UniProtKB/Swiss-Prot annotation:
<feature type="signal peptide" description="Tat-type signal">
    <location>
        <begin position="1"/>
        <end position="35"/>
    </location>
</feature>
<comment type="function">
    <text>Hydrolyzes the gluconolactone formed by glucose-fructose oxidoreductase, and that formed in aerobic conditions by the glucose dehydrogenase present.</text>
</comment>
<dbReference type="InterPro" id="IPR013658">
    <property type="entry name" value="SGL"/>
</dbReference>
<dbReference type="InterPro" id="IPR011042">
    <property type="entry name" value="6-blade_b-propeller_TolB-like"/>
</dbReference>
<keyword id="KW-0574">Periplasm</keyword>
<protein>
    <recommendedName>
        <fullName>Gluconolactonase</fullName>
        <ecNumber>3.1.1.17</ecNumber>
    </recommendedName>
</protein>
<dbReference type="GO" id="GO:0042597">
    <property type="term" value="C:periplasmic space"/>
</dbReference>
<keyword id="KW-0378">Hydrolase</keyword>
<keyword id="KW-0719">Serine esterase</keyword>
<dbReference type="GO" id="GO:0046178">
    <property type="term" value="P:D-gluconate biosynthetic process"/>
</dbReference>
<dbReference type="InterPro" id="IPR051262">
    <property type="entry name" value="SMP-30/CGR1_Lactonase"/>
</dbReference>
<dbReference type="Pfam" id="PF08450">
    <property type="entry name" value="SGL"/>
</dbReference>
<comment type="pathway">
    <text>Carbohydrate acid metabolism; D-gluconate biosynthesis; D-gluconate from D-glucono-1,5-lactone: step 1/1.</text>
</comment>
<dbReference type="GO" id="GO:0004341">
    <property type="term" value="F:gluconolactonase activity"/>
</dbReference>
<keyword id="KW-0732">Signal</keyword>
<comment type="subunit">
    <text>Homodimer.</text>
</comment>
<dbReference type="InterPro" id="IPR005511">
    <property type="entry name" value="SMP-30"/>
</dbReference>
Length: 356
């Protein structure tokens, strides 16, 4: 593991107070449970590989990886909505948010899920919603590539409202993923992946791709501006560590930030570099979304699938899709022992021994 110490100047920029906006937007709702169901649902893909005996307490290698949804352009951002017993997941390029229930299968929850249609020509490669979490208010908080904002969605009325869409007057690039602290602060990443031409986009206003922390009182801190492609993120259960992936071919890394009592980073450590897996082994995917269980085990997507890291950093195992199939993100759901994974054109689930 490689350690690099950051100064306060490198860790933090000046904070800015951001009021919670009152804007709302509506979206077309389709309640039919027909879309995205085909004969692949119920089949299995991939495999589970054990690197350490410690994996046995978390996951059985014989557990099937079951397909629950298919025919998706690019699945992302799964979130389990406990108050309703359903899964939501994004399809960013299709501008759709879908819903899955054990009984009814898959239906369209929001369309458009991000930018209002028609989409401006030449501006967006991913106009829809991306990462999602259930907030302390019971709303679905969304890292929305299309509106270039952190949004929230009422799970009953499906009304959308803007939480924050700028830092110091400059529009976000295309928020990608988010994670809540116990206090209700939300950490989120802002790479350029939603924009056509990425960093060269004509509508990009920031000259960096940031990681931010929004406090419950509306204070917004830029906590990292030095990553080329910040993407997935997760907090350790004791909230002393923030994991952040960098989804860049040149530096495919997962970083661990040590946090102070205010939830702000003081240093960062390299958990793992995936150049070998990506370049030498040719495994599909890059460091992307992640989640964490109640014991602090990290489930992180990277070249080859979902890697499972113990709190001490040891890599315990790997959940893989079919060859050439990247896995982009994951969440725990149902009774806490099901890991839902967005897997390219599919969404799959894996039963776990651990609770998330």
């Amino acid at each position: 593991m490689t350690t690099g110490r950051m100064s306060r100047r490198e860790c933090l920029s000046a904070a800015v107070m951001v009021p919670i906006a009152a804007m709302t937007a509506t979206a077309t709702i389709t309640g039919s449970a027909q879309a995205a169901k085909n004969n692949m649902n119920g089949s299995t893909i991939g495999k589970i590989t054990k690197f350490s005996p410690r994996l046995d307490a978390i996951l059985d290698v014989s557990t099937p990886i079951e397909v629950i949804a298919s025919d998706i352009q690019w699945s992302e951002g799964p979130v389990w909505v406990k108050n309703g017993n359903f899964l939501l997941f994004s399809d960013p390029p299709a501008n759709i948010m879908r819903k899955w229930t054990p009984d009814a299968g898959v239906s369209i929850f929001l369309k458009p899920s991000g930018h209002a249609e028609p989409i401006p020509a030449g501006q967006f490669r991913e106009p829809g919603s991306n990462g999602m979490k259930v907030g302390p208010d019971g709303k679905i908080w969304v890292a929305d590539s299309g509106t270039r904002a952190i949004m929230k969605v009422d799970p009953v009325t499906r009304q959308r409202s803007v939480v924050v869409d700028n830092y110091k007057g400059k529009r976000f690039n295309s928020p990608n993923d988010l994670f809540f602290s116990k206090s209700g602060a939300v950490y989120f990443t802002d790479p350029p992946y939603g924009l056509t031409n990425l960093d060269e986009s004509d509508i990009k206003e920031m000259n960096y791709n940031g990681v931010f922390r929004l406090s419950p009182d509306g204070r917004l801190d830029l906590i990292e501006a030095g990553l080329s492609r910040p993407n997935g993120l997760a907090l350790s259960p004791d909230e002393t560590k923030l994991y952040v992936s960098n989804s860049d071919r040149a530096s495919p890394n997962i970083w661990v930030y040590s946090l102070d009592s205010n939830g702000l980073p003081t240093s960062r450590t390299l958990l793992r570099n995936f150049r070998k897996e990506y370049f030498d082994q040719g495994l599909a995917g890059l460091p992307d979304g992640m989640n964490i269980d109640k014991q602090g085990n990290l489930f992180a997507s990277a070249p080859g699938g979902i890697y499972i890291f113990a709190p001490d950093g040891e890599c315990l195992g790997l959940i893989s899709g079919n060859p050439g199939q990247p896995l982009s993100n994951c969440c725990f759901g149902e009774k806490g022992q099901t890991l839902f994974i967005s897997a390219s054109h599919n969404v799959v689930r894996v039963r776990t021994k651990t609770f998330g």
